[in-house]
């Protein structure tokens, strides 16, 4: 049996991934989040209750749920682009939440996953839904750029740790610009907060945003199936 743990399954790309994964043979998908829809409660193998803004409340992995697991994949999809704005104007609370959701919580969870899989000789794959923001600076996205880059580096170190081994694999996926709630958030700010606002509004107006379902199918085909 192949197990998958997915964060951010309630909407956007995460929801598309969840719907596809829940229909795959020989695959069980567990979802992580604050709350779950009736659909998730019904279709998921397990619902792991955890608000990623509270890393100290991270749940322990239940060994009984994965007793017959041959391979385990963690899809790190949850993320927040807030706060958007100039450095010097940002909310301390939102900065902290960005660090917790985009970096601290997934880092801690991956640390637990590596230990869990190593002790049970389970092959681990981590699929990190990343962003160009992890690789270069974007004005107005200081928190997003910094936290995505930090988690990417953490996983790069993990990849280096397992260099030459098949026990763990790390894949970074940049899904591009999609038609999601995050894009709506970005388009709703003012240009002073985000100088590239007109560019992102044009993506939407000109139909340049990718459909999450299409991106999800591509990710599963390349990295999961």
Region annotations inferred by a language model:
Residues 10-19:
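N-terminal Rossmann NAD(P)H-binding glycine-rich loop of SDR-like oxidoreductase domains
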Residues 42-56:
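Rossmann-fold cofactor-recognition segment
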Residues 79-96, 115, 140:
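Conserved mid-core segment of classical short-chain dehydrogenase/reductases
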Residues 110, 147:
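Active-site helix of classical SDR
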Residues 131:
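Residue(s) in the substrate-gating loop at a strand-loop-helix junction
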Residues 137-145, 157:
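Active-site loop-to-helix junction immediately N-terminal to the catalytic Tyr of the SDR YXXXK motif
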Residues 168, 172-175, 180, 188-225:
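C-terminal helical subdomain
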